[in-house]
């Protein structure tokens, strides 16, 4: 009988110890609020610099991305201002203009970019990831409700810093690491449509 009482007491103590040492989960209220705000932003423009690193090449370009709902206009220029690549999506149609002014059309932006440049870029997910939205992938958030990391099977994103924009906190420095390509995005300016 005494053995049963001792075992019951030890079991209760173990449960109490486990409950008291359990880590507190971060308050996700900040993340829910941040996510709802970001999901409501469907029209925006960013300007900044993009470093593109592949096993064969390393380069840096200026980037201007204008998002209008599901459509976008991406402009990559050299540091001197000459066009490297321009890409427009209107409906299902993708148009890419290269540095020589040659137009390429299709419906698969990632395939067109890879075919023309050799760069693997997650074009379809970029509008969401640039804003700091993980979608249905694994992610980590900080206590302020901002995404610090997103992981997919092909890509891992690190959000180093955020900047205040019209009362919002928007990503400023993001690193995208893929199997063969690394992208480092520094956003100098955000414009959010009201």
From Swiss-Prot:
<keyword id="KW-0472">Membrane</keyword>
<feature type="lipid moiety-binding region" description="N-palmitoyl cysteine">
    <location>
        <position position="19"/>
    </location>
</feature>
<keyword id="KW-0143">Chaperone</keyword>
<dbReference type="GO" id="GO:0015031">
    <property type="term" value="P:protein transport"/>
</dbReference>
<protein>
    <recommendedName>
        <fullName>Outer-membrane lipoprotein LolB</fullName>
    </recommendedName>
</protein>
<keyword id="KW-0564">Palmitate</keyword>
<dbReference type="Pfam" id="PF03550">
    <property type="entry name" value="LolB"/>
</dbReference>
<feature type="signal peptide">
    <location>
        <begin position="1"/>
        <end position="18"/>
    </location>
</feature>
<dbReference type="GO" id="GO:0009279">
    <property type="term" value="C:cell outer membrane"/>
</dbReference>
<comment type="subunit">
    <text>Monomer.</text>
</comment>
<dbReference type="InterPro" id="IPR004565">
    <property type="entry name" value="OM_lipoprot_LolB"/>
</dbReference>
<dbReference type="GO" id="GO:0044874">
    <property type="term" value="P:lipoprotein localization to outer membrane"/>
</dbReference>
<comment type="similarity">
    <text>Belongs to the LolB family.</text>
</comment>
<dbReference type="InterPro" id="IPR029046">
    <property type="entry name" value="LolA/LolB/LppX"/>
</dbReference>
<keyword id="KW-0732">Signal</keyword>
<keyword id="KW-0449">Lipoprotein</keyword>
<feature type="lipid moiety-binding region" description="S-diacylglycerol cysteine">
    <location>
        <position position="19"/>
    </location>
</feature>
<keyword id="KW-0653">Protein transport</keyword>
<keyword id="KW-0998">Cell outer membrane</keyword>
<keyword id="KW-0813">Transport</keyword>
<comment type="function">
    <text>Plays a critical role in the incorporation of lipoproteins in the outer membrane after they are released by the LolA protein.</text>
</comment>
């Amino acid at each position: 009988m005494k053995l049963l009482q001792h075992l019951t007491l030890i079991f209760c103590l173990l449960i109490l110890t486990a409950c008291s040492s359990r880590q507190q989960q971060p308050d996700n209220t900040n993340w829910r609020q941040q996510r709802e705000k970001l999901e409501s932003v469907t029209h925006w423009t960013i300007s900044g610099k993009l470093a593109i690193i592949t096993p064969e090449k390393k380069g840096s370009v200026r980037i201007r991305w204008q998002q209008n709902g599901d459509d976008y206009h991406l402009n990559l220029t050299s540091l001197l201002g000459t066009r490297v690549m321009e890409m427009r999506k209107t409906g299902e149609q993708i148009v890419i203009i290269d540095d020589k002014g040659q137009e390429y059309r299709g419906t698969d932006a990632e395939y067109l970019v890879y075919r023309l440049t050799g760069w693997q870029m997650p074009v379809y997910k970029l509008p969401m990831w640039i804003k700091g939205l993980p979608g249905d992938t694994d992610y980590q958030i900080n206590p302020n409700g901002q995404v610090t990391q997103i992981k997919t099977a092909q890509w891992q994103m690190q959000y180093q810093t955020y900047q205040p924009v019209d009362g919002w906190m928007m990503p400023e420095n993001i690193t995208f690491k893929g199997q063969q390509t690394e992208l480092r995005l520094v956003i100098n300016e955000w414009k959010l449509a009201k």
